[in-house]
Each structure stands twice: as C-alpha cells, then as structure tokens.
Amino acid sequence: MAQCNLFYQYPITPILEGHVRNILICTEKDVEKLQSQSSLRLREKIDQGHRDKLLRMRLKTELDALQKKMQKDSDVLNSHLKAIEDALLFTNDGEVNVETKADAQLIPKSPEKLEKFNQVAITPLDPFIRFTDDFRGEMINTFFNNAQMWNFTFGSWFYKLKRVFYNEPGLRRALKLTNVDSLTISKELLAVTVNALEQATVYPIFGSEMSDLEAALCILAAFYSTYENSQIDERTTLVDVITLLPVIFRLLGSEITALKNVSPSGTYFGFNDPSCMKFFVPMRKGKHYAENTFGNHVLIKMLLGRGVMQKIPGEKISQNFDVEARLHGAIKNDVLVYWTYQLMRPKLGNNVPIFIHDQHYLRSGLVAIESLFLLWRI
C-alpha cells in the first residue's frame, strides 16, 4: 500500500485540481460557506414572507375599515338625496306628488280622503307635517288639546294681554271665558299673532322706497297734526315722531273707543281681500287693491273722519272729493301727502310715493300701526 500513497496524498494539495470525472473538488470550508450562504438567503426569504404577510393583513384591515366608512357615507348620502327629492316634489302651491314610493304607505288610498289630504315641510330635510283642511288651525288646536301640558307662562306682558281680552264683555261671551287663565284666551291670542305675522311678512321688498315703519310714522304724524296744540311742525323728523308715539297712541285709542261706542262692530282691524287672492301685492296696475279692500278697516274710518285722507280710489267709504286735483297744486291741503313729503323728503328727495296711489305703502303702514299700537297697549 505504501506504493499507492502518492496516488491518494500529495505533498502539496493542488487548488481546483481536475478530477477524473471532470468535477471540481470543493473543500469542506467551501461547502460550509455555501451552506451558510444558502441558509442566510433562505432566512431572508422567510423573513420577507412574514413581512409580506403582516403587510397584507394590515392592508386587509384598512380596506375593511374603508369599506365600512364608504358604506356608511353612502347610506347618509342616499338619505339626503331622498330628502332632497321629496323637497323637489313640491309645486309652487305647496302640493306634493303623491305617487312617490316613500309616501305611498302614508297617503290615504281613497279618492275622497286624498282630496282632503295635504302636507307641509318646514325645511327641505325635515319630515312632512300632514293636515286635513287648515294647517294653522289644526296646529293651534293640537297645541291646546291637553290642558295638563300647559304649566308655564310667557311673563307679565302676556297676562296683561289676556286681561284685556277677559275684560271685553263681547269677547268673554263669544269665547265662553270663565277665568283669565282659560286656555281659550291663549289659543285665540296665538291665532291672532300668527295671522298678524302672516300679514306682516308677505309684503314685497322689491322696488320699495320706504319701510312699513316709515309708512306708519307718516300716517301717525298726519293723524296727530289734525289736533290743536300738536307738537309737530315742518322741522319734525321721523325720530321726533317716534318719541311722540305714546301721546299719539292715547289719541288713537280714544278715537277707536269713540267709533266702538257708535258701532260695536265697527272696530275691525282687517282687509276685505278677495277669496282668490294669494299675495298682498296690488294687482290692479301694480298699485291699487281690489275695490272695498280697505272698506271696513277701523283705522281707515278714523283717518277719513279726522280729514287725514280725502279719498281712496275705488272705495265706497270715501267722501265725494277728488284728491287728484290737489296732487300737483296746494299739497298742504292733503294732510297725508303733505306729511309724507315732509318726513321722507330728506331721504327720497322729490320721489316720495303717494299712499293713495301706491297702496301697498298704505297697507303696510296700517299693519305696522296695528303692531305698534298692540305693543303700546301691552
């Protein structure tokens, strides 16, 4: 065997010695190095797989949360779109298209009930309030349906106003009042207040030269000037008229009481509007109301009696006096025209409206006087 040692063992180990089968010979150190590198790459692959798994789990969680949020926002958007669609169903007269699926279950099926069925929305996104004939009356009746619910007060001013109602024998009999705290008084006051607000908030704001308060002050100044020893002259301003309102309202109350003594039914604060009238804009040439609109109003009767107004075009209650001849002549002979010109000239110059022609100023001024007089009485 000693002769074969040189075949298996060389004195100097050759590097990359050719093998008999043409295979490179690797040392154990190289093999260990290759194994270490393979293990390291495998470990990196495993770590990368774990990281990808964690990222996919986190992405799935975020996508689930985003899906839930989008679903919630979509539901809210659909509800808003449904409310907007319901609001757009209103016509100019406040009617609603009753063929929608959402309202189909809430609307009476029979034609007889459907003709009497109406609904009103306060704001576009609120549910509808349904009523049968009169929304205002049914709402007020609902408020005062249960006496046990009314355990509060509006203050001393409301009690004083109820006392005025209770002290009127005619109202006490008509409303069947037994005590001043009767809910019938509060019910009637609320109805009167709503009616007054309705009249005070529908006047046109386009092309108006003066406000309803300014129109009221012009009428009151003309009324006050008809009394002897009145404290107004050509230097009087609108502010001066406001300071004189307590004195003017005392005289106004005396005139109304005198008219009431002559005719108990003559103290009517209202206008004879046609039944087909929808807006308080004068429809006759854009300036005049229908005939006899002012016919029964107590303030008109009082102004005519004091000579503040000579004639209202088309009215049967006026005197046979043609004010047209005085409009461009001696203007001082017409008291209302004169004081309107005196008080509004600093603001409007020569473009001062004449109330008997631009009658929406006359009407808005009368309604403002009613409101101011009511506040003074309270």
Curated annotation (Swiss-Prot):
Pfam family, one: Herpes_UL25
One cellular-component annotation, GO: host cell nucleus
Main location: virion
Subcellular localization(s) per the UniProt record: Virion; Host nucleus
GO terms classed as biological process: viral genome packaging
Entry keyword set: Capsid protein, Host nucleus, Viral genome packaging, Viral release from host cell, Virion
Function of the protein: Plays a role at the late stage in the encapsidation of viral DNA, assuring correct genome cleavage and presumably stabilizing capsids that contain full-lengtht viral genomes. Located on the external vertices of the T=16 icosahedric capsid, may bind together the tegument and the capsid through interaction with large tegument protein U31.
Subunit comment: Heterodimerizes with packaging protein U64. Interacts with major capsid protein U57 and triplex capsid protein U29, essentially at the pentamer vertices. May interact with large tegument protein U31.
Stated family: Belongs to the herpesviridae UL25 family.
Name recorded for this polypeptide: Virion-packaging protein UL25 homolog
Organism: Human herpesvirus 6A (strain GS)
